[in-house]
């Protein structure tokens, strides 16, 4: 027998269960992967390996980036001006410096991801606003509910494709030049 020493971690009480959480953004940073721009966003009370990685995504119709900009919009970060263009869809001008996200509150959706090493928590790429009223942008309980429901729907759609992007599915479909005409025998 021997006398041993062990260090007991105190834990920080962070909640890793699946579901919506209102968090405060600690910091954020832009980077690139395979020529694709993304932003990593970290949160107070969570370690450095628990972040949201959000890739730049452009709307095919309007040609406007929306995935990263929603993080600024929903947290009311860097908002410079909101212009009513008469269409019922205001135009928001914002400063996309990641430092503007620091200290801002936002709702994030945690989900569980299965790997060969086990299951771990991740943060979904689409946030939802918190209830707030400002001179630039305001969000009601109804707005928050709408954006949460929309993010959940998009998450479930992504999950049902087993994590594959629409573009990868389209690529596979377009590479099949001679699809079989007969029914599959089994």
PLM regions: where:
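Short beta-rich binding modules
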Residues: 1-186
């Amino acid at each position: 027998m021997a006398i041993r020493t062990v260090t007991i971690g105190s834990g920080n009480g962070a909640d890793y269960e699946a579901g919506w959480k209102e968090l405060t953004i600690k910091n954020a940073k832009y980077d690139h992967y395979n020529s694709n721009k993304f932003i990593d966003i970290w949160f107070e009370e969570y370690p450095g390996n628990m972040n949201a990685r959000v890739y730049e995504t452009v709307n095919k119709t309007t040609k406007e980036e929306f995935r990263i900009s929603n993080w600024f919009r929903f947290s009311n970060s860097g908002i410079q001006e909101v212009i009513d263009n008469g269409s019922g869809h205001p135009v928001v001008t914002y400063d996309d410096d990641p430092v503007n996200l620091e200290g801002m509150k936002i709702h994030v959706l945690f989900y569980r991801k299965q790997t060969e090493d086990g299951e771990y928590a991740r943060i979904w790429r689409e946030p939802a606003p918190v209830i707030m009223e400002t001179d630039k942008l305001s969000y009601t309980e109804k707005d928050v509910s709408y954006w949460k429901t929309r993010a959940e729907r998009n998450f479930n759609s992504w999950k049902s494709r087993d994590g594959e992007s629409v573009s990868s599915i389209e690529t596979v479909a377009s590479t099949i030049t001679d699809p079989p005409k007969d029914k599959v025998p089994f």
